[in-house]
C-alpha cells in the first residue's frame, strides 16, 4: 500500500510512550497493577509501554472483537479472556485505539463483574470525535481525527501492523 501519509514517526511515538510509562509509574507507586493488552492491535504499544513502567506488573491478554477484515461487524465477541484473578487489584487496559468506545465499554463491564479495585484505560490513539458511548481514556497517547490509520499495531485486513510509524490511509480500499 503506497497511498498513505505518515502522521507520527517512530521517534515521536517512542517519546510519548516513555512519557505515558512515567505517568503510570507515578500514579501506581507501591502498587502492582494488572496490565491487560487488548490483542491484536495493542501489542506493539503494550510491549513498548510496559518496558517504560518502572513497577512490578502482572501482565495478561484479552481479545475482544467487533471488527472483521477491516470492516465493522457491530457484534461483540470475546475471543480470548484474561486468566489473571483481578478481584481487589488495580487494572490498566491497554488499547491501540478508542473509537466508538463500544468494545471497550463492553469489556470494562465484564471486568467490573470480577470486582477489581479500579479499571483505567491507556490508549495509544483516542478518536474522541467518533465516541458513541461514555468512556474515559485515562492515559492517551495521541488524539487523532477521523481517518483510517495503519502501522504501530493498526492494520488493514491484518496487514501493515509492523510499520514503525502511524500513517493515515488516503482513499482506503473498499472492503
Which ranges hold each PLM region?
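PRPP-associated nucleotide enzymes
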Residues: 1-175
Amino acid at each position: 500500500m503506497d497511498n498513505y501519509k505518515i502522521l507520527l514517526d517512530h521517534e515521536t511515538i517512542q517519546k510519548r510512550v516513555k512519557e505515558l510509562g512515567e505517568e503510570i509509574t507515578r500514579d501506581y507507586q507501591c502498587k502492582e497493577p494488572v496490565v491487560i493488552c487488548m490483542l491484536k492491535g495493542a501489542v506493539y504499544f503494550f510491549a513498548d509501554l510496559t518496558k517504560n513502567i518502572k513497577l512490578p506488573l502482572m501482565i495478561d491478554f484479552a481479545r475482544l472483537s467487533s471488527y472483521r477484515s477491516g470492516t465493522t461487524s457491530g457484534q461483540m465477541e470475546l475471543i480470548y479472556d484474561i486468566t489473571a484473578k483481578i478481584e481487589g487489584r488495580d487494572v490498566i487496559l491497554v488499547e491501540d485505539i478508542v473509537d466508538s468506545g463500544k468494545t471497550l465499554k463492553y469489556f470494562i463491564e465484564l471486568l467490573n463483574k470480577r470486582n477489581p479495585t479500579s479499571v483505567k484505560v491507556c490508549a495509544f490513539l483516542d478518536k474522541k470525535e467518533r465516541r458513541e458511548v461514555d468512556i474515559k481514556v485515562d492515559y492517551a497517547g495521541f488524539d487523532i481525527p477521523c481517518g483510517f490509520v495503519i502501522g504501530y499495531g493498526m492494520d488493514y485486513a491484518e496487514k501493515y501492523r509492523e510499520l514503525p510509524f502511524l500513517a493515515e490511509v488516503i482513499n482506503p480500499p473498499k472492503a
